[in-house]
Amino acid sequence: MSLLLTLKDAQKDAMKAKDKERLKPIRMVLAAIKQREIDEQITLDDAGITSVIVKLVKQRRDSYTQYKDAGRDDLADIEANEITALEAFLPQ
């Protein structure tokens, strides 16, 4: 199964389970994929989708570090949860 289908299935499952903490990063990934496809006028394969996810994880890690340094543990915890949710879709 392609990574895009896996993401869409995970979105459906999170919506059915009413799991907002898991749904938010999945929607974010799908939006970033669609944006890149529109901007570059291409259809992304699994490697392209993986690169989008890696970029988003890197952004979240940077935000996590900044929030920790600023003493905003509440926001840092949210970023950590998003990192965990995104890393579940990266290949091992």
Cite the ranges covered by each PLM segment.
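N-terminal cationic and glycine-rich segments that engage phosphates or anionic surfaces
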Residues: M1-Q92
